[in-house]
């Protein structure tokens, strides 16, 4: 004798027979979920394989270079500002306006030849580079604290010495009846004469090698 099924139980059994079992997410079977899972895994692997360690040092190096250039630029600007301030301070001092000195200067200039006047004008326009003089003073004194007044004085003294060296070399060339540019032999003779006249400072420290 057959028992009749409950209508509710019969409906549940029919639904279970019609719907297939759900596949696990990210499983091996072919479906939308499995393809999305493989795509995510591949993207993760690609991101892990990127040469991150290679790019980061380059960015760091670029940053260090930019910082170094900025520091050097600030240092140059500070040096230029210091030079400008020193020039402004020097202009505050009154210039020599003694009539006797001015008349003497005019008398000397009137006796210059055309070649001498050209050299004198070049001498007045010329100037030694202050950064190079600063490096020289640092090497001589061994101190990094070199003030701008000291650099200006050293440049002025060196400029006067070079001018006397050139003029004495021209006198040597005139005595030898030679023309053209100044040669090393003329500079050596000029230096020897200036040394005999006491215009070359003596060494305070003896030479180690002769």
Curated annotation (Swiss-Prot):
Start-end of Acidic residues biased regions: 11-20, 76-87
Region (Disordered): 1-98
GO molecular function terms listed in the Swiss-Prot or TrEMBL record: protein heterodimerization activity
Key words of the record: Activator, Nucleus, Transcription, Transcription regulation
Chief location: nucleus
Alphabetized Pfam families for the sequence: TAFII28
Entry annotated with the keyword Transcription regulation: yes
Tissue note: Expressed in roots, leaves and inflorescences.
Compartments where located: Nucleus
Family that this chain belongs to: Belongs to the TAF11 family.
Subunit structure of this chain's protein: Component of the TFIID complex. TFIID is composed of TATA binding protein (TBP) and a number of TBP-associated factors (TAFs) whose MWs range from 14-217 kDa. Interacts with TAF12, TAF12B and TAF13.
Name of the protein described by the UniProt record: Transcription initiation factor TFIID subunit 11
């Amino acid at each position: 004798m057959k028992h009749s099924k409950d209508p509710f139980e019969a409906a549940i059994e029919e639904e279970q027979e019609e719907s297939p079992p759900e596949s696990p997410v990210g499983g091996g079977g072919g479906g939308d979920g499995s393809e999305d899972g493989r795509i995510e895994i591949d993207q993760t692997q690609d991101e892990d394989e990127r040469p991150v360690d290679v790019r980061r040092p380059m960015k760091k190096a670029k940053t260090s270079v930019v910082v170094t250039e900025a520091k050097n630029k600030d240092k140059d600007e500070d040096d230029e500002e210091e030079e400008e301030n020193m020039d402004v301070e020097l202009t505050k001092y009154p210039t020599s306006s003694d009539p006797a000195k001015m008349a003497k200067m005019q008398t000397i200039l009137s006796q210059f030849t055309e070649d001498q006047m050209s050299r004198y004008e070049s001498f007045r326009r010329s100037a030694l580079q202050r950064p190079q003089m600063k490096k020289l003073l640092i090497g001589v004194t061994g101190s990094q604290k070199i003030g701008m007044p000291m650099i200006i004085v050293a440049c002025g003294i060196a400029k006067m010495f070079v001018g006397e060296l050139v003029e004495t070399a021209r006198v040597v060339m005139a005595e030898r009846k030679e023309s053209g540019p100044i040669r090393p032999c003329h500079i050596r003779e000029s230096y020897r004469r200036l040394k005999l006249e006491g215009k070359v400072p003596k060494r305070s420290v003896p030479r180690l090698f002769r």
